[in-house]
């Protein structure tokens, strides 16, 4: 006994976005790029600053160097998020202007 409603489409195309669409490709590429940046930049800066800048150059103790570099990493996460939000709103504004011209 199957119950299917003609008003509810059951194709996969309705459940998942069309990845051949240029807008969807751009959004996925943007998401992957910022996801990698938000992982790599803070982690790399934390360990590089701790090892080479605070301990190596300034001669700060290991615990203090870790604290300072962690604070900078947190700030960098917020900077990357701010850049991502700015880029997203800028892209959204551009789409609205294009739709108004049509």
UniProtKB/Swiss-Prot annotation:
GO terms for cellular component: endoplasmic reticulum membrane; endoplasmic reticulum-Golgi intermediate compartment membrane; ER to Golgi transport vesicle membrane. Residues 55-67 are lumenal. It is a multi-pass membrane protein. The keyword Repressor does not apply. The chain crosses the membrane at residues 34-54, 68-88. Its main location: endoplasmic reticulum. Residues 1-33, 89-102 are cytoplasmic. InterPro entries: Vma21 (IPR019013). Coiled coil: none annotated. It is found in: Endoplasmic reticulum membrane; Endoplasmic reticulum-Golgi intermediate compartment membrane; Cytoplasmic vesicle, COPII-coated vesicle membrane. Keywords: Cytoplasmic vesicle, Endoplasmic reticulum, Membrane, Transmembrane, Transmembrane helix. Required for the assembly of the V0 complex of the vacuolar ATPase (V-ATPase) in the endoplasmic reticulum. Based on the gene model, may be part of a dicistronic locus. This is Vacuolar ATPase assembly integral membrane protein VMA21 homolog. It comes from Caenorhabditis elegans.
